Design a protein with these regions (language model features):
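ATP-dependent adenylation/nucleotidyltransferase module used to activate substrates
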Residues: 5-234
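Mid-to-C-terminal catalytic subdomains of enzymes
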Residues: 226-250
Length: 250
């Protein structure tokens, strides 16, 4: 079934980036990319924020894995910022409960430095600050797969590290804890969300085997954006066609 008429292929011409439309639809394109990922990388995990894009990517990746690699487990990483919409937390909660026996689940609730615009006196806010438990916006989730200060296998974590560094160091720890083999983190970012996302995806210098949607983080650790050319309508079309669960906030 066609999800979109065209796949957007991003290429370089005369030192500038351009969009080139092809006859391949975005669903066919993401199947091809997932095949490439599963063939190229030993360790695969999805960064699942609880948003509509990462949720769609998680569902697509699981469908592909169940069909073609039934004996291979993927990881699912959720970075919990404590103060988030209740509907988002409910979606993350039911997703983890649904897939916990099929994947390696990692629900991370560690103190981290997050920039805040809500204070005139502090530059950073620290979700899950262990020194201010009485001020927590919500209670710590209580599941075996929750990573917090009392249960933290992440040897690359540093107390109150920047939120961006925490995500990167999770990738590094995932690689270390899985035999130091070639590892990729799948991100649900799309080029049409913003110029910043567009520029982030168009990697001219550190792409993997001429694929601009895969970028290097560390030695043998990569990040990939398999749905980079999907539109907002493609996301909802897929959710409808495949009857996927999604974050009702959207």
């Amino acid at each position: 079934t066609q999800i979109a008429k065209f796949n957007i292929k991003l290429g370089e011409s005369n030192m500038y980036m351009r969009k080139q439309y092809t006859e391949q639809n975005v669903y066919e394109a993401v199947q091809k990319r997932l095949k490439f990922i599963f063939e190229e990388f030993d360790n695969i995990f999805v960064s699942f924020s609880g948003g509509k894009d990462s949720g769609l990517l998680l569902n697509l990746t699981q469908d592909f894995q169940r069909k073609y690699y039934p004996n291979k487990k993927i990881g699912v990483f959720h970075q919990d910022f404590e103060a988030q919409y209740t509907v988002t937390t409910e979606y993350v909660d039911r997703t983890f409960k649904r897939i916990q026996n099929e994947v390696e689940p990692y629900w991370v609730c560690l103190p981290m430095a997050t920039r805040t615009a809500l204070s005139s006196y502090q530059m950073y806010w620290y979700p899950w600050d262990d020194t201010k438990k009485h001020l927590w916006v919500r209670s710590m989730p209580q599941y075996p797969y929750v990573i917090n200060l009392e249960h933290n296998p992440m040897t690359t974590y540093h107390y109150r590290m920047y939120q961006e560094d925490l995500a990167k160091q999770f990738s590094r720890w995932y690689q270390i804890s899985h035999g130091n083999k070639k590892t990729v983190c799948l991100l649900g970012i799309r080029a049409d969300e913003s110029l910043q996302r567009y520029s982030a995806i168009l990697n001219k210098k550190y792409g993997y085997k001429d694929e601009c949607w895969i970028s290097k983080q560390f030695k043998d650790v990569w990040v990939a954006s398999p749905i980079y050319d999907w539109s907002n309508s493609d996301i909802w079309h897929a959710n409808y066609l495949f009857n996927y669960d999604y974050n009702r906030l959207y």
